Curated annotation (Swiss-Prot):
Pfam families: DPCD. Coiled coil: none annotated. Signal peptide: none annotated. It comes from Xenopus tropicalis (Western clawed frog). It comes from the Eukaryota. This is Protein DPCD. PANTHER family: PROTEIN DPCD. InterPro entries: DPCD. Belongs to the DPCD family.
């Protein structure tokens, strides 16, 4: 999906907007039945959460797939919760963007910065994190670039390491920045319902 058609899809989607807990929460329903939910900081307008879900062949909703933001905490007392508690020292991979860049944080990586390398694989359209001690390896794509059919640029990629956390940054290309500005204008034109109000307006 090229950049103009992705922007048009966003504009054409049915949208509901609510202001809650200092966040502007936007729900999108696309013509193909997919749903996207985003949460923005109400003051800075920075994206905090983006997640997707779609119906199965039987019409049941699947689980939300997190694209940006921390995964939801498991319910206390469940098997999953106990399992996560045991493996809390394992690396955790989350995406948290800024206005000018896509950013990923991998916690629980204690090695020195010199151990890591972060590269672009243009053929597979992904970024790859490697360590010289072979203790960590991760391939990940940038869905925003895929949706807009924009090429990956190695020069836009950088990384830092502090407090056992590897921070990988990819500078947003101008096409993405323009798209996000246009989307913010679109969202500002939506009627926003405050928390506690019953009705939300969908456009």
């Amino acid at each position: 999906m090229a950049l103009p058609s992705w922007l048009e899809s966003l504009k054409a989607a049915q949208k509901t907007c609510i202001l809650q807990d200092g966040r502007r929460k936007v729900h999108y329903l696309f013509s193909d039945g997919k749903e996207m939910a985003e949460e923005y900081d109400a003051k800075s307008h920075e994206l905090l959460v983006r997640k997707w879900r779609q119906k199965s062949a039987l019409g049941a909703y699947g689980q939300w797939q997190i694209e940006v933001g921390d995964p939801p905490l498991p319910v206390a007392g469940t098997i999953q919760s106990d399992f996560l508690k045991e493996s809390s020292s394992n690396p955790t991979f989350t995406r948290k963007d800024t206005k000018s860049s896509f950013q990923w944080r991998i916690r629980n990586l204690p090695y020195a910065k010199e151990v890591y390398s972060v590269t672009v694989d243009k053929k597979d359209r992904c970024c790859i994190i490697r360590t010289t001690n072979k203790k960590y390896y991760k391939k990940f794509s940038i869905p925003d670039l895929d949706r807009c059919q924009l090429d990956l640029n190695e020069n836009a990629l950088s990384f830092a390491h502090a407090n056992n956390t590897l921070i990988v940054t990819y500078q947003k290309p101008k096409e993405i920045l323009s798209l996000e500005e246009e989307l913010q204008r679109e969202l500002k034109s939506l009627k926003t319902t405050n928390e506690g109000d019953v009705e939300c307006k969908t456009q």
